[in-house]
Amino acid sequence: DGTLIGDSNGIYRTDENGEILISGLQPGKSVVVTETQAPPGYLIDTQAQTVQIKEGRTVSLNFKNQPKGELIIQKRDSATGQPLAGAQFRVTTAAGCEVGLDGVIGDSTLTQNGIFTTDSSGEIRITNLAPGAYVLTEIKAPHGYVMDAPSTNVVIGEGGDTQTVVITNTPKGGLVINKLDSVTHEPLEGVEFTITEAD
């Protein structure tokens, strides 16, 4: 009949063994059990279970929670493989919803401006991710580097899947012009050049 059983909200909480024992239920009634909150780091079991209470019997129900996944972004120099700090990324679901530092999707848990920055070891770690497709968009390369690919797709699988994505940046190039005396090979000061991009 929809009447709540338990505390004033009809809520029971598991003990240290992950169990709840409910006694004194009236035989012949059907009870619907719905998980309303998963433990930290786990996905909620959305499947409600209905059970018929029988006189003198204790019925067991099992709910299973899958661990959430983790994403590790590693930023590296494309030539040397050295880690790069200071790269900035925006992480979204395939549907375009922004992901926060703790993996929760929505406005309340976003990092500052929704941007993740690689640390001194060139990494970003995001935990508590639900299985699904994500898009990593590099919005700023580290100083002295150019972006090789602005977006990378990654899929977090079920069962606590951890995905490590290595994204590289190419160091910016340089140009050295030497102006020398053709006879003495001494450097010549004050010479002007015009530099343009080739077609």
Across the structure, where does each feature detected by a protein language model lie?
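Solvent-exposed loop/turn and edge beta-strand elements of beta-rich ligand-binding domains
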Residues: 1-199
